[in-house]
Amino acid sequence: QIDTDWKLGFVGRNGRGKTTFLNLLLGKYEYSGKILSSVQFDYFPYPVSDKNRITEDILQEVCPLAEEWELMRELSYLDVDVDVLWRPFETLSNGEQTKVLLAALFLNEGHFLLIDEPTNHLDAKARKSVATYLKKKKGFILVSHDRRFLDDCVDHILSINRANIEVQSGNFSSWMSNFERQQEFELALNERLQKDIRRLQQSAKRAAVWSERVE
């Protein structure tokens, strides 16, 4: 069970099914069982079909109920000049495109964001700006290979493991510390079991030899 106020970092090795999981939430795949949700899921990056259009027109498509002043407020939080609203979307830098789409998606009340690798086209300054912005928001799942970025803006970690999916409170560093501790415990347990197996095998051999001698 996931609280819709959480800021969730989503981690797991490549190929473990992170993208598949997001697509299940978005209703793109058929599945057995039930996914119960009180919110609508939105995906980032939002697909912009015609980048020649004016940015404000695109953002009104993303968040049709938002007022212009609300967009301007969100852009100010992300250190983006509001004049981007009246420029063709394709003239914005990759970082500006990332920021304006995130700002618009967060204006959809009652929606839960699935944010997939938002830092791919961001420089260090823009990453810090987006991390600060996300830290003040709530209600999202964030997929990122940037560990520092995850540490800066999440309060829970959702992890896909070999045998299960689990949720832990904390940021990426605390999750990694717990994960490594668990790995060390399992390794030590396995080594102890192997020693016990070898000891029992040796005992069985000695018993067999003793039995043969008695006979």
What is each PLM-predicted segment?
Residues 1, 184-215:
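Flexible nucleotide-interacting loop at or near the entrance of a catalytic core
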Residues 1-191:
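ABC ATP-binding cassette signature C-motif
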